[in-house]
Amino acid sequence: SDVYKRQGCVIGKHGFGFFPINNQNLRYPHIGIVIIEDNCEIGCGATIDRGSMSNTVIGKNTYLDNQIHIAHNVKIGQNSIIAGQVGIAGSSVIGNNVKIGGQAGISGHLKIGNNVEIGGGSGVIRDIPDNTKVMGYPAKNIREFLRNN
């Protein structure tokens, strides 16, 4: 209950998954669903893919800004805020109380811990432990990023 879906969002479409056979790219079946828990908001133009073999989950009290893409099998924990134009690739797990700045990208099959902050425009290509702030490409601890830039 109390889920707000803004204009133009697409929820539950097939994910982007193909496998090559005999010089053809065949679509990988996506049989999971999207679960959106209570008190969430999904911004305009956001897309959330259904899971392939498991479900895609948006945790309670999570807010997604406009033009965000959440790929198949992604799990987002509770109380998270994700700014516009963020892309989260397939099968990544985002913890609770996570904040992701605009235009950040998160590669597939990663684990982002609880209480993590990811700066805008960052490229996350490795797991991030709990209680960490990162920024840059590749995303680094924010103190290291600021010291070197």
Q: Can you describe what each PLM-predicted range is?
A:
Residues 12-24:
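Acidic/polar low-complexity surface segments
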Residues 10, 123-124:
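Conserved sequence/active-site signature of Rossmann-fold short-chain dehydrogenase/reductase
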Residues 2-4:
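Short, small-residue-biased leader/transition segments that mark boundaries at the very start
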Residues 10, 16, 45-47:
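Active-site beta-loop-alpha junctions enriched in small/polar residues
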Residues 24-49, 54-71, 75-117, 121-123, ...:
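C-terminal segments of enzyme domains that contribute to small-molecule binding surfaces
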